[in-house]
Amino acid sequence: MSDEPIFEEEMGETELREEAMNWWQRGYQAQMRQQLDEAIEHYTRSIEIFPTAEAYTFRGWAKSLQGKLDEAIEECIKAIEVDPDYGNPYNDIGAYLIQKGDMRGAIPWLERAFDTNGYECPFYPRFNLGRVYEEFGDLLKAVNLYKEAYDLNPNYKQALLAFRRLQARLN
């Protein structure tokens, strides 16, 4: 085995994916330490090696934490272009639009997140959509969405609290 560095041009798809994942993991670790600029650099390196929906989505999340919501939305759109079945960016766009005060604009994005197969946290878009309908005064729809979110993840206490709060208002 040679001590020569392996250049990306010489790597196969599997190796490129693995290398990109290593950079993504570095980015995630930096983000968890609140080192957002470093995280963005690592996510960017991951994308340069092998673009993935995860890297774009998480780079968007890091940018959102810097208050760059429009850039975060752009990153999520790139993620969807790479993998339309990855659910996180749909929910994230909805959440960023909620933060921007565009409740109506958030609805189709959150609803699309329901229908994706590649989403490990399907309770988030239901909770976020519940927030939208609560804001619009449709408390029955909101309480049902909070309940769905809680049913999908009984450890998601925020959904349980919102469900109980609205249930009490409706009674």
Task: Walk through the language-model features, giving the residues of each.
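A conserved position within tetratricopeptide repeats
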Residues: 47, 80, 114-116, 150, ...
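Short coil turns that delineate tetratricopeptide repeat
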Residues: 17, 50-51, 84, 118-120, ...
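TPR alpha-solenoid repeat register
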Residues: 22, 55-56, 89, 123-125, ...
